[in-house]
Curated annotation (Swiss-Prot):
It comes from the Eukaryota. It comes from Caenorhabditis elegans. The gene is gst-5. Conjugation of reduced glutathione to a wide number of exogenous and endogenous hydrophobic electrophiles. May play a role in the detoxification of reactive oxygen species produced during pathogenic bacterial infection. This is Probable glutathione S-transferase 5. Glutathione binds at Y8, W39, K43, G51, Q52, L53, Q65, S66. It is an enzyme of class 2 (transferase).
Length: 207
């Protein structure tokens, strides 16, 4: 029997999509949550392959980088698309999501108190342009699939990632008036029984 251990901070962040993959698959794993106080010592021991979180251990073997972990788990549990083309489309969306996250990072860091800058100025100048561009792309994918999922006619891991991000934005008062399709998408994905149960029972964290 394969043993899985996911190590990440006690927050959703970059570890959440992997947790939701496990939840959807009904797969047992160790959800190892590291506090900010514990992290320096863990980092010093080089337990994390690249000196950062999250990382996944599979029968003791370590895999780092959140999207690499998600792609691996998605393949294991059939959430990577039904064909090679669908998998490539999922990966293209994931890469674009990373680009968007990089563009918007100064705003998110300021909101969380981890970075400098005026939140409202960063929202206007950095976040909103990045958000509207990326979510415009997502609308195109939803329209092309016609299924309510971003790629193909079934759930993939990128649905989980985008739905969680949308839900986080909505919970903080994000304006989805221009993107009702993505609000509906988040509601659809997070109403899937396994995901709904996970959301209801997971630890409550600010991010």
């Amino acid at each position: 029997m394969v043993s899985y251990k996911l190590t990440y901070f006690n927050g959703r962040g970059a570890g959440e999509v992997s947790r939701q993959i496990f939840a959807y698959a009904g797969q047992q794993y160790e959800d190892n949550r590291v506090t900010q106080e514990q992290w320096p010592a863990l980092k010093e021991t080089c337990a994390a392959p690249f000196g950062q979180l999250p990382f996944l251990e599979v029968d003791g073997k370590k895999l780092a980088q959140s999207h690499a972990i998600a792609r691996f788990l998605a393949r294991e549990f059939k959430l990577n698309g039904k064909t090679a083309w669908e998998e490539a489309q999922v990966n293209s969306l994931a890469d674009q999501y990373k680009d968007y996250s990089s563009e918007a990072r100064p705003y998110f860091y300021a909101v969380m108190g981890f970075g400098p800058g005026d939140v409202e100025t960063l929202k206007k100048d950095i976040f909103l342009p990045a958000f509207e561009k990326f979510y415009g792309f997502l609308v195109n994918f939803l329209k092309a699939s016609g299924s309510g999922f971003l790629v193909g006619d079934s759930l993939t891991w990128i649905d989980l990632a985008i739905a969680q991000h949308s839900a986080d934005l909505i919970a903080k008062g994000g304006d989805f008036s221009k993107f009702p399709e993505l609000k509906a998408h988040a509601e659809k994905i997070q109403a899937i029984p396994q995901i709904k149960k996970w959301i209801e029972t997971r630890p409550v964290t600010p991010f």
